[in-house]
């Protein structure tokens, strides 16, 4: 085997190496008789839903190659690699008739060495009737749920091979008549070089590092009846005003290491292999791997397309209390298979793109992600 092919083969093995490493970590966790109780202890899980359909189709490994407006979400450092202003809008048909939407815009300046961007994401559903044990047919009242975050990003190229970025964001969680607010930071780096004249990129991302959410509002108000002491006569009185106190909940902080390598890097076509290892506060360590085939200037035109697929693994979260083993092993994966594709057109500084991704959510079924992007 030639030195050239040996290097590329070694890199692909390294990318796929995330697979046994992740499986070993899961087996070690199960062998130590520790169940995965971190899941469900964090608030604002919608922060993990994603941004662009391209990133959703490529799973957790995408931060290594995110260089458009979606980098504001996936890796702030990638925004510094943008060659032109870019805007992106996405909509996600989530489960149980809920919908997640995301939008971002970014502007390079200072000769393209620095980029400033803004993003907003929201998850919610329409008004629903309120049912109680005393009024199972409905109280006549209605409630809604809306979770929103907004962020500002600043990213910069510190050399021709290294960029870094930071995002500050505010998170608002409105659950009917109860609500809470938190603040968080995202940090990201991107190291880009070449191996045997083929691009290679490393990314390190720390996301959702911030304050806890504590809920308050009218939903926590309660009337406390007066209870007489033993031996005392009951004293008629109206319930006294009171309020339940809630525990504060942390955000789903995530640390991610991603690697991407262009196995094929021709003038108008590219095959990229990606791998990722991640650790969330709400779950045990996980990993993902994926690939993307992209072609541009089809037939000498400005049209191009991309095809993507990935698999993201996170330890199952349904633990049998008797055997301490996974109860629904295959169906309880946080993420599974994701596939997608997109069409784009470029002419000079103008670019437009449409992308789609399908992500399997285990027992929750399949979900669809659509994205429209514009560059100028």
Q: Which residues fall in each region the model found?
A:
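Short strand-turn segments of transmembrane beta-barrel domains in outer membranes
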Residues: 60-63, 85-94, 357-359
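Cleavable N-terminal export/targeting peptides
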Residues: 1-41
């Amino acid at each position: 085997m030639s030195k050239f092919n040996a290097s590329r083969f070694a890199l692909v093995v390294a990318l796929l190496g995330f697979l046994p490493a992740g499986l070993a970590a899961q087996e070690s966790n199960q062998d130590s008789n520790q169940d995965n109780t971190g899941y469900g202890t964090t608030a604002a899980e919608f922060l993990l839903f994603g941004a662009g359909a391209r990133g959703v189709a490529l799973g957790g490994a995408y931060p290594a190659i995110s260089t458009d407006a979606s980098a504001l979400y996936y890796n702030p450092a990638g925004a510094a690699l943008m060659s032109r202003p870019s805007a992106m809008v996405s909509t996600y048909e989530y489960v149980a008739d809920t919908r997640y939407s995301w939008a971002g815009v970014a502007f390079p300046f200072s000769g393209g060495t620095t980029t400033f961007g803004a993003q907003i994401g929201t998850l919610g559903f329409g008004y629903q009737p309120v049912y109680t044990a005393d009024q199972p047919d409905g109280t006549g009242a209605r409630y809604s749920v809306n979770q929103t975050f907004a962020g500002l990003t600043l990213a910069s190229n510190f050399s021709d091979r290294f960029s870094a970025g930071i995002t500050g964001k505010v998170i608002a969680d409105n659950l009917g008549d109860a609500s809470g607010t938190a603040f968080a930071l995202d940090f990201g780096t991107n190291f880009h070089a070449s191996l045997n004249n083929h691009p290679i990129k490393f990314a390190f991302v720390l996301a959702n590092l911030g304050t806890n959410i504590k809920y308050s509002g009218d939903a926590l108000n309660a009337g406390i009846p007066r209870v007489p002491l033993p031996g005392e006569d009951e004293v008629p009185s109206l319930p006294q005003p009171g309020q339940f106190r809630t525990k504060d909940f942390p955000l789903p902080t995530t640390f991610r290491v991603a690697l991407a390598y262009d196995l094929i890097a021709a003038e108008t076509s590219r095959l990229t292999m990606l791998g990722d290892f991640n650790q969330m506060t709400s779950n045990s360590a996980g990993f993902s791997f994926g690939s993307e085939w992209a072609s541009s200037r089809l037939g000498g035109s400005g049209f191009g397309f991309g095809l993507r697929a990935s698999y993201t693994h996170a330890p199952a979260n349904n633990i049998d209390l008797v055997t301490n083993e996974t109860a629904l092993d295959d169906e309880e994966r946080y993420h599974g298979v994701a596939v997608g594709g997109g069409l784009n057109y470029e002419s000079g500084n103008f670019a437009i793109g449409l992308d789609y991704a399908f992500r399997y959510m285990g027992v929750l079924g399949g979900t669809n992600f659509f994205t429209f992007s514009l560059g100028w």
